[in-house]
Every structure is written in structure tokens, then in C-alpha cells.
Amino acid sequence: IGVRPNDFSRTPDEFFHNVAQEQRRGLHPRWLVREQSYWTPIGVASGSASALLNEEGLLEVDRGSFSLEPFLFADGQLVTWADAEITQQLEDGSLPIPSARWRANGFALTTTAFATAVSGDPVLFVRYRIENTGDAPRVARLFCALRPFQVNPPWQAFRGLGGACAVGELRWHAGAV
């Protein structure tokens, strides 16, 4: 425990920026180490809700809400976006179903998100796919962190969107958060 100056936590965003600066790169979204990350929206044409997927696989599940961030644990090491070679793609090259793909330590992790309407309501789906890219069998674990961060960084804030966000309540129901 230490005493910090007021500027360390002047705003929630500054607090999280400063915490991220003191930890290993990759443990937090890229914008928390003041690096730009690009993103794409995901939604349905008639829906009022929309999600964002950034190039590292961070998924903001609804406008201005929390995000889901994947991590792999393999061979006693935590693998993050900062450890990986990252590419992006659209399903079949042109369908509006974006994916972010990591390649690191003999594994590939692909995060794919899409939305559709179910009974007239927009529903977001996300798939995490882990592939062993080596020759020998290996074990890996997927951790999906629910984070109080939007995909948009605070320097792209618009109408209250961008940066850290409050998570007021979480509920597990029928196998879903």
C-alpha cells in the first residue's frame, strides 16, 4: 500500500491508466497503455443495440457497457494480446461477421462476434476458438475477463461513451451473464 498524488486517480480513466502502466503490458486493454486500437461495430439493421469488437478481440457487448477480454493460459504462462501476432478478418472474406485472431506460443485464438434478431430483439453471439498449431497435443485454458472498460478509449469519447464504465449488476441465468 502506498500514498499516491491526487492526479493518480483524478478520474476513473486516469486511475486505470496509472494502474495499467505499473503492470505487464497486455493485462489490460490496449488503450489503457495509451495505444490506439481500432474497432468495428456489430449489430442488426433494425436494432437499437450495438456491440464493438476491437482488433485484439476485446468485445464491448452493448453501447457504453462492459467488455469481455480473452486470455489463454498454457504451459504455465498467461498469454495476452501483447504476446501475440494479431490479424483480423471477415467471415468468408466479406460477410459482416468480424474476427480477431491471435497466434502465440503454438496456439491460435480466434474471437468471432455477430448479432442477429431473435423474436424481434437483437442478440449478440461470441465464439472463442482455440487451435493447437503445433504437432504435439497440449492443454490450454481460456479465461474470459468481464472488464469495466469500453472498447472506445477516453480520447475518442462521444456523448459519454469511451473509457471506463460502471458495472452495476451481474447476473448468471440459464448459462449466460
Regions found by a protein language model. Give the residues of each.
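Terminal accessory carbohydrate-recognition/targeting modules of carbohydrate-active enzymes
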Residues: 1-177
